[in-house]
Amino acid sequence: MLDTIELSKKLIEFDSVTPAKQDIFDFLIKIFKEQGFDTKQLNFDGDGSYEVINLMATYGSPQTNGKHFNFLCHVDVVPPGNIEDWDTHPFEPTIKDGYL
């Protein structure tokens, strides 16, 4: 079973400032597949200046009217601004006072 804190920490480590890079999607695809999901990467032109990547993960089959779960997301983040303004580095996960 996945540990949500450890998974969150690994996701935070990715510098996924828009446009998000392929490495975070490769990581997520691996995680989803290990959990039994089917995955599909969706690439779009965005505004034409960069490629936008989204990921769809499906557990179960919607075609059989059985129970299923779909996860569709993008994983890019806004630029962090001046790193020196942060208490901790935005891409170095830190647990402080019980909070990640």
Question: What is the meaning of each model-derived region?
Answer:
Residues 68-100:
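Active-site metal-coordination/substrate-binding segment of hydrolases
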Residues 15, 25, 40-41, 75-78, ...:
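Short secondary-structure boundary micro-motifs
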Residues 17-65, 91-92:
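A non-catalytic alpha/beta surface segment that caps or lines the substrate-entry region
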Residues 14, 18, 99:
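Active-site oxyanion-binding pockets that recognize sulfate/phosphate
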